[in-house]
Amino acid sequence: MILLTFKNILSNGISYEKDEDNLETSIVNLKSKKEWLHSQKIDDLLDYFDALGQYWKNNTDKNFGNNLKYVSEFLSRENLVKELKISLRGNISSLDKFVNLFDDNEFSYHAQPRGISVHWIAGNVDVLGIFSVIQALLTKNLCLIKVPKNYSLFKNLILSLKQVSTKKIDGKDLVNCITLIYIDRNDLKNQEILSKNADIRIAWGGKEAVSTILSLKKNFFTEDIIYGPKYSYAILDSEFLKDNLKDSAQKLALDVSIFDQYACNSPHTIFIENDDPNFSIVKKFAKELSNSMESVNRLMLPKSQTSEKKLMEILSLRAEYDFKGEVFASKNMDWTVVYSEDEGLANPCFSRVVFVRPIKNAEEVGKFHNRKIQSIGLGISNLKKQEKRIDF
């Protein structure tokens, strides 16, 4: 007997939560919503998502998760317009109609939706998947979403779209443009059906998960968007820290804590440019960062449940650096700041574990760079020095 691994969680705006044996039927139903979504005006969609952001901001609770308030900031009309202008050559009206290209009457362009965007959402921080879903809907692409095994939070977020309506858009109609399914990671047959029906494949997750998705057969013109295992870090110099030590520690503690470092732009290593042989400013910063980590965890973003495997990994790492450095940590496993004089970028542990390391000259980090680097946070006292430090 072969167990069904395809579960229809949400389609046609209705929560089903039942096993089914025909994934193609769900896909056909979703495609029927294409015309409605394509007909919506970008201004109306912007109004809707701005209102949704306000709704989420005012209703952040255990049903939606602690990180939602930061997602809501992304949904502000001002931010979404800025993001769209970057991608659409400055004219967001191109999503609705043909517009002149660079004020040239001889050439026009119209940004057409691709069709069905298929999202493989990672299980470690499922709220992050909302970013790609919102952007897909905003550009009028239907969303077929393979959720992780623990999908209740993500499902609650999608269903909450029904609670928001604006003058032109009823959230219930927008939810009809989304289908949620669960497929076992080893069910490559149904995974391939997803892939072959995708006009865009959007993959969230680690290297192994993303590689599996990319290996699936797809149509020739299907495009891939990868939210894979990127790495971010920060560089501060001692001159900058003279006046900004506490403020920098607070901001970095928040960056580390949001999404528990599973977001690509969360720092894992913080370099302090320092010529003091005693590294006093580096140690002082590590201590201040630990105070801020505790405050963020207690007052703003309480740590969510952590797997036993990750707890053991953190415990082992703390024991290692008790001998070769200095560890500032919570009494439990909520957060960990590791000071050491090791060279280079630390291997990421995630789960609010951040490394603070001295570096004699910030330009040295250039030798550690590769395509995996996503973001660099800078706290450099001099603008010219700042530009030089990041031009690797």
Residue ranges with predicted function:
Residues 157-163, 212-217, 284-289, 384-392:
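Short, aromatic/basic amphipathic alpha-helical patches
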Residues 102-121, 182-192, 334-350:
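Donor nucleotide-activated moiety binding/catalytic core segment of transferases
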Residues 250, 258-377, 387-392:
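NAD(P)-dependent aldehyde/semialdehyde dehydrogenase
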Residues 1-114:
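N-terminal Rossmann-like NAD(P)+-binding subdomain of aldehyde/semialdehyde dehydrogenases
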Residues 170-276:
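Conserved NAD(P)+-binding/catalytic subdomain of aldehyde/semialdehyde dehydrogenases
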Residues 119-123, 146-148, 183-184, 203-206, ...:
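Short His-Asn-centered micro-motif
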Residues 96-165:
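Conserved small-residue-rich beta-alpha loop and adjacent elements
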